[in-house]
Amino acid sequence: MARLPCGIYFETYDKERAYIRTKPQALFLVLFFIGLLVAPFLLSVRFVSMMNLTMITMICIVGLQITTGYAGQLNLGQSAFMGMGAFVASSLTVHFHLPFYLAIPAGGLGGGLMGIIFGIPAYRVKGFYLALTTIAAQIIFPILIMRMPASIFGGSMGFHLDPATFFGISLDNEFKLYYLVMPCTVLFVGFAFNLVRTRIGRAFIAIRDNDIVAEMMGISPLSYKTAAFFIGGSFAGVAGSLWALYIRYIAVDQFTLWYSVWYIGMIIVGGMGNILGAILGTVFIRSLEEIITTLGPYLSQHYPQIGGGAIWLAGMNIILGGTIVLFLIFEPKGLVHRWKILKASYRIWPFPYS
């Protein structure tokens, strides 16, 4: 009980705004980061692979949370921004032999610039019409890649990449790639947590709540809406660069509108307007996908009457879509709302939370 904070325990605003406000929080974070460092030594290759894919997706979803959850700009082109980052990084790696630690930021810049191009109309349109504008990114992206000379973006064949190397070490397996993906994820998620606490983050929230009032207060909607798309696109571009280095083959059919819709679904499940919500939503949906993928072949083998792989592919989409609908109906604030209730209950234990 001596370690449990209760009542009014913040004496200054700085303490209230601090990242780590209690000793249990500090202990949890230390154990969490130790767990991240030793995880590949304790887990199977398949589980490490799942963690790598989840963390790459997480970077993309955190960027989408900044654009949509904080700035209120509905973005259905995140997959295209991710694809642009992947193709830029791959082109620089294959044609110019740029090392991965330079190709990844370049991919982020490519995704961010594409975000600016399709984010500028956000100054004039919003809601449904803005969604249509960002869908245009998904339509234009594959046409652009296919029409450009194959010597630039690989054309219809895409790119085959060699394993990245770092000081002579080839990053050619899940274990080694984990120690590339994990630090990048920690860096960008940490940046996002800090960003939304700054003046820029508060401006995003003001524009989301009421852009007219925000403009009257001296906030430039054009500047901040464009910045939101640039930041979100940059996160997606970095995720795309990591994706390309991870699977070592990319093509335009890996970055379709379908994935952009699922990305929106992840922040709905996790909770809009909260970086932790993006993290929880990504982990939840990716874990659910893995469970369905694991159970599908087993059930098809033991119960052949239910159908084969195609049935389970359709079933996965139905289950994931149904999950999102259930969250919209029964938990519209997402998993992060449950987490906040859990924290509040912990702080006042043994008294009931109401």
For the regions a protein language model found, what residue spans apply to each?
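Transmembrane alpha-helices and adjacent helix-loop boundaries
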Residues: 1-354
